[in-house]
């Protein structure tokens, strides 16, 4: 379910799964690089090539680790989004039953003429419903922050690995 409040859990999950699939493919290639490096070490005389392969392995390890961490974070985020979206749907039912509207994650009174009784009903229900909406907004914010942190850490780790790789290739 896609909505303007929480986002699209399906797309997040799909991207997370794709990143984790790429990790598996990279790790399969890693075995080939390890075998080549070991053969060259045994045969001797190719120290520069072995050093380059070792550097490539370190880069590959970093990329695979960060892809897997990012994919895992996105899939966790997708699960959280789906749960929050369902909670928002249930909250919306309660809000409507109280004669109110949910605008994003704000519980508001709709426009129109109303009776004193309905106004009092809305006035009594609104604070509790807004607290529920606020808890959902807080949960959504925490999930977004946790996911963004993993992505930022991954970006920094990949940038450092790329710099180290470029430095090695310039020697």
Residue ranges and their predicted role:
Residues 1-171:
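N-terminal secretion-targeting helices of virulence/extracellular proteins
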């Amino acid at each position: 379910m896609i909505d303007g409040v929480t986002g699209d859990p399906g797309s997040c999950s799909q991207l997370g799964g794709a990143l984790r699939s790429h990790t598996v493919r990279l790790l399969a290639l890693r075995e080939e690089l390890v075998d080549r490096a070991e053969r060259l070490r045994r045969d001797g005389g190719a120290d520069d090539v072995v050093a380059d392969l070792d550097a490539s392995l370190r880069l590959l390890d970093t990329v695979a680790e960060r892809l897997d961490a990012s994919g895992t974070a996105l899939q966790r985020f997708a699960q959280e989004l789906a749960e929050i979206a369902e909670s928002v749907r249930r909250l919306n039912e309660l809000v409507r039953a109280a004669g109110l509207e949910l605008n994003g994650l704000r519980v508001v009174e709709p426009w129109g003429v109303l009776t004193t009784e309905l106004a009092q009903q809305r006035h009594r229900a609104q604070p509790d419903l807004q607290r529920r909406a606020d808890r959902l907004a807080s949960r959504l914010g925490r999930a977004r922050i946790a996911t963004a942190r993993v992505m930022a850490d991954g970006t920094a780790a990949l940038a450092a690995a790329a710099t180290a790789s470029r430095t090695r290739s310039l020697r």
